[in-house]
């Protein structure tokens, strides 16, 4: 009888220990949820919503009791490394909630959620009116048939000189900030794009379709630019790569060079006004597509590009 009691007691101890172990992930999930709430609160506020409305929205969505002082601290801390006060003020004064315009393209069976930030586009693109026209008219002018086949020549590899910059680049910081606030079900790629489109000072669009026919190479090029920025008087094409350091530099740089060439052709903006880069949370690689010398043989044709 005593042996039976000891067996039952041991089983009860094991069950209690199992319950304690199972409770730990819940605390971790709670922490993850809180960091998600911080990122979503900042984004909702930066879309032009007031502190009061942001609190109401977040508390209702997550069934929380977020305090005003906590939200204000999050906002102030974010502004310290990405000061977008001027953009938000303009949104509140002029745009009445009409901030993000979006349209989904289905290309080769994949859905691409093209979006542009209208206030930032209006504020930053004074010198690039043809780019504005290109973005606004994509919904009706993007040729579906050009994207049905694989428009990029995977064998094309150009010798492009790329400069590596430090991890403290703002793009890396924003990617790091946004990636800390996702769960296992979220697509990190789209999370970074959405967060930068809403909160970054220079990002005007994401998942931008581009296409053209490179007549010298006799190659059709089509694809989607992850992020489009306006800064330092130039148009930046950014590609988010979760492990940027391990990427094949020639492959990524070639793709970005061709996308920049295509966007230059479509908008009539000189290639000298473009910059190309790819990045993750720790690394940022950039090059000027107009400063590249290379030769490449494709389809039995030798193509030279010299300055």
Regions found by a protein language model. Give the residues of each.
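Major-groove recognition helix of helix-turn-helix-like DNA-binding domains
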Residues: 1, 64-83
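Short Lys/Arg-enriched helix C-cap and helix-to-coil transition segments
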Residues: 4-5, 79-99
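Short, Lys/Arg-enriched anionic-surface-contact patches
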Residues: 16-37
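Short, amphipathic alpha-helical "recognition" segments used to contact nucleic acids or chromatin
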Residues: 32-49
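Short, charged amphipathic recognition helices of the HTH superfamily
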Residues: 46-60
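An acidic, glycine-rich, mixed-charge low-complexity segment common to nucleic-acid enzymes
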Residues: 91-152
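Catalytic cores of nuclease domains that cleave nucleic-acid phosphodiester backbones
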Residues: 156-236
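Nucleic-acid nuclease catalytic cores
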Residues: 223, 230-295
């Amino acid at each position: 009888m005593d042996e039976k009691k000891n067996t039952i007691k041991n089983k009860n101890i094991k069950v209690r220990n199992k319950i304690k172990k199972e409770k730990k992930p819940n605390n971790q999930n709670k922490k993850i949820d809180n960091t998600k709430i911080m990122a979503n609160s900042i984004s909702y506020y930066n879309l032009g919503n007031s502190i009061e409305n942001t609190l109401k929205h977040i508390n209702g969505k997550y069934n929380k009791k977020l305090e005003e002082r906590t939200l204000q601290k999050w906002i102030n801390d974010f502004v310290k490394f990405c000061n977008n006060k001027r953009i938000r003020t303009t949104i509140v004064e002029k745009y009445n909630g009409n901030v993000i315009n979006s349209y989904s393209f289905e290309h080769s069976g994949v859905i691409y959620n093209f979006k542009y930030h209208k206030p930032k586009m209006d504020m930053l693109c004074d010198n690039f009116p043809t780019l504005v026209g290109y973005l606004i008219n994509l919904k009706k002018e993007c040729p579906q048939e050009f994207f049905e086949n694989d428009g990029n020549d995977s064998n094309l590899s150009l010798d492009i000189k790329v400069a590596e910059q430090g991890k403290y680049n703002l793009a890396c910081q924003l990617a790091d900030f946004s990636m800390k606030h996702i769960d296992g079900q979220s697509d990190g790629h789209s999370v970074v794009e959405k967060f930068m489109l809403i909160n970054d000072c220079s990002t005007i669009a994401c998942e931008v379709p581009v296409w053209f026919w490179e007549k010298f190479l006799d190659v059709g090029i089509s694809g989607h630019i992850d992020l489009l920025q306006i800064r330092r008087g130039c148009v930046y094409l950014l590609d988010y790569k979760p492990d940027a350091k391990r990427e094949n530099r020639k492959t990524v740089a070639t793709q970005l060079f061709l996308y920049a060439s295509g966007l230059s052709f479509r908008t009539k903006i000189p290639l000298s006004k473009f910059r190309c880069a790819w990045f993750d949370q720790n690394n940022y690689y950039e090059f000027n597509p107009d400063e590249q010398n290379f030769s490449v043989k494709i389809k039995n044709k030798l193509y030279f590009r010299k300055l």
